[in-house]
């Protein structure tokens, strides 16, 4: 189904479960995989088939889930499930909400908020099959080696689906069936509406099972069929942390393979993690232990890694980022960062610039070709073009109450261990001496020094550190050599014998 195709009348996403096996204060469907919540993945897949309406059923942590869903998909209708349990009841209340004003006609798709690998392509296939075969119900199924816990698909001799038996209600013979119900369906809206009127809670769980609709539809003369997917991961849900981890790993594997097919080199896929929201160009090279999160983008010919984590960072063409932890930053084309660099939000490094080893930056703009090579901190600052910041330089931006800015011009050269006490401005082409503490503005082209003349307190170590190794070595160095210690090859006159 292409983006221009007419989609189903509605998609209903079921997300009311408590997810107790996750053992978390965070609602199960809000746990993330690949940089997006599980329900976020579900909403994305649902929207991709262009439904006329989309509803999401909530109950557990209702307000928290509703807020998240509204932010992710403002057009989604939030529906509250009442005290009557079961998927059948969840769909019933959603359908009533969707029917407000005018009853739905056409196809209604039901899916879940905890099936993060389900794709829009598979949902589109389900809808297409359902409508082309004029089915009353079409269920998405998969064949598993171990079907424990899943509802089993019951079929007639002609292959049509006669019903679904929940695992806890299944006989031993039925439990041997390996074809399972994914819980994802396409219904004719009128058939669904009518069948739900007859669904009861008369079962082992005391719930309204949505699966009962299949039998009721068949009894009413409707055709019930299935679409079988060979990709079991698309119908796998996450009920606990173990399943969440497995789904996350599979999702990451698919993302990495997709990028490699698109021209990205991933040296070690087993140690590389890429969120689904990341964008990479051709000929990007990712080295081992690289993690790319959020809205990170990496341009052509850039190299990232090893041992690098970037979140919401834009990396320019041909840039190199080595052993760096960065967030909310921009790295210009052909710039270099690292190793052991910490880029905090607001860092902007210009083209061909450099932030080197053991540097931390925050809310700083660094001009084209400027270099901060090693051992320093630059925060709340603006640095011009082609400036060289010496080793150990620091912008002292915080006075204990407020943050202040440092402005350093273009073509500036600063000596080692210079401290800029903000607010302060250094003009274009200025220099600072080693160890300078810059408290006042420096005019363009000036040399700023702030150290007093050096004073040597001779004999201080001998007087104050008696008996130490330093004192003993100093004493030996200060004691004149005796005649007997002179080389026998030298005469009293100092001439060679």
Regions found by a protein language model. Name each.
Residues 1-10, 32, 36-113, 117-128, ...:
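Conserved N-terminal catalytic core of the sugar/cofactor nucleotidyltransferase
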Residues 26-32, 83, 199-202:
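Short glycine-enriched, charge-decorated loop/helix-capping segments at active-site entrances
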């Amino acid at each position: 189904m292409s983006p221009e195709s007419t989609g189903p009348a509605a998609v209903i996403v079921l997300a009311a479960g408590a997810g107790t096996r996750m053992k978390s204060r965070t609602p199960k469907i809000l746990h993330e995989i690949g940089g997006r919540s599980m329900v976020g993945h579900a909403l994305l897949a649902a929207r991709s088939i262009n439904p006329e309406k989309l509803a999401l059923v909530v109950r557990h942590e209702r307000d928290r889930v509703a807020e998240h869903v509204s932010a992710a998909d403002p057009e989604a209708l939030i529906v509250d499930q009442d005290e009557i349990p079961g998927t059948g009841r969840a769909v019933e209340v959603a359908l009533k909400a969707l029917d407000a004003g005018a009853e739905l006609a056409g196809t209604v798709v039901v899916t879940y908020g905890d099936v993060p690998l389900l794709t829009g392509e598979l949902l589109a296939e389900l809808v297409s099959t359902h409508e082309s075969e004029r089915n009353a119900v079409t269920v998405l199924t998969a064949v598993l080696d171990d079907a424990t816990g899943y509802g089993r698909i019951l079929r007639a001799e002609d292959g049509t689906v006669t019903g679904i038996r929940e695992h806890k209600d299944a006989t031993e013979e039925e439990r041997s069936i390996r074809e399972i119900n994914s819980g994802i369906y396409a219904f004719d809206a009128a058939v669904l509406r009518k069948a739900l009127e007859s669904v009861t809670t008369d079962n082992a769980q005391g719930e309204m099972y949505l699966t009962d609709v299949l039998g009721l539809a068949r009894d009413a003369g409707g055709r019930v069929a299935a679409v079988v997917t060979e990709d079991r991961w698309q119908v796998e849900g996450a009920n606990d942390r173990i399943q969440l981890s497995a789904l996350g790993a599979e999702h990451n594997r698919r993302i990495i393979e997709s990028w490699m097919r698109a021209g990205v080199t991933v040296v070690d896929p087993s140690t590389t993690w890429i969120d689904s929201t990341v964008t990479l160009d051709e000929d990007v090279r990712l080295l081992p232990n690289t993690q790319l999160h959020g809205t990170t983008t990496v341009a052509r010919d850039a190299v990232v890694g090893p041992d690098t984590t970037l979140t919401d960072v834009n990396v320019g063409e041909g840039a190199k980022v080595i052993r760096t932890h960065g967030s909310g930053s921009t790295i210009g084309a052909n710039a270099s960062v690292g190793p052991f660099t910490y880029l905090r939000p607001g860092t902007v490094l210009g083209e061909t610039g450099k932030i080197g080893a053991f540097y931390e930056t925050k809310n700083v703009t660094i001009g084209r070709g400027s270099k901060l090579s090693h051992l320093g901190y630059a925060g709340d600052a603006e640095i011009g073009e082609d400036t060289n910041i010496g080793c150990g330089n620091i912008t002292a931006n915080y006075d204990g109450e407020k943050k202040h800015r440092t402005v350093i011009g273009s073509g500036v050269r600063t000596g080692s261990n210079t401290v800029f006490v903000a607010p302060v401005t250094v003009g274009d082409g200025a220099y600072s001496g080693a160890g300078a503490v810059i408290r006042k503005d420096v005019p363009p082209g000036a040399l700023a020094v702030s150290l007093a003349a050096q004073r040597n307190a001779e004999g201080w170590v001998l007087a104050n550190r008696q008996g130490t190794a330093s004192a003993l070595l100093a004493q030996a160095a200060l004691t004149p050599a005796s005649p007997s210690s002179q080389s026998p090859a030298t005469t009293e006159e100092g001439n060679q014998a």
